[in-house]
């Protein structure tokens, strides 16, 4: 079991085998094979096996501040995901949704790249994580989530916020 904790990073888990009770804040999810959950930065979350079967899942923990789209005119991932959190977008994605965004392949490839660590592995992992994040955004868009001017307005706010957070930590 992973007891309740939080950190400054985003975390995404993908269930490969078994069944788990996944909690984030007041949200409780019963997740099985092929399901995925996203924990926003600073969200208190936990994971407990809720079946006698072995639980096996992959974890991607990332600093959302360090992954951005390349287009200058695109809002930063951190602003989009913060906006989605404020709008209460689902942090749970079922097997059909994860198949649509190829989450299993992405997780397996990231794990393989981390194990082998051949030249450029970090670039491949960053690319795969970007694909996963865009996939999540597209799933949210199917649920009427829109990326509008409010998201762009937050880009500068988070720059100042991150600087003050860094100063506070040090």
Question: Predicted regions: what is each one?
Answer:
Residues 91-99, 114-127, 133-170:
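Short, Lys/Arg-enriched, Trp-marked, Pro/Gly-tolerant hinge/linker segments that flank
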Residues 1-6, 14, 38, 59, ...:
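Short intrinsically disordered, low-complexity coil segments enriched in acidic
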Residues 17, 41, 62-64:
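Residues immediately flanking
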Residues 48-112, 138-143:
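A hydrophobic/aromatic-rich effector-binding and dimerization subdomain
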């Amino acid at each position: 079991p992973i007891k309740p904790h939080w950190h400054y990073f985003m975390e995404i888990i993908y269930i490969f085998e078994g069944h788990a009770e996944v909690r984030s804040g007041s949200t409780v999810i019963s997740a099985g094979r092929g399901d995925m959950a996203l924990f926003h930065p600073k969200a208190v979350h936990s994971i407990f096996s809720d079946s006698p079967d072995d639980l096996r899942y992959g974890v991607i923990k990332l600093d959302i501040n360090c992954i951005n789209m390349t287009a200058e005119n695109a809002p930063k991932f951190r602003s989009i995901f913060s906006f989605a959190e404020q709008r209460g977008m689902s942090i749970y994605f079922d097997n059909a949704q994860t198949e649509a965004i190829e989450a299993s392949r992405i997780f397996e490839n990231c794990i393989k790249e981390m194990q082998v660590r051949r030249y450029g592995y970090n670039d491949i992992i960053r690319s795969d994580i970007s694909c996963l994040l865009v996939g999540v955004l597209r799933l949210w868009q199917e649920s009427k989530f829109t990326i509008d001017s409010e998201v762009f307005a937050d880009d500068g706010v988070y720059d100042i916020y991150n600087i003050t957070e860094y100063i506070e930590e040090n």
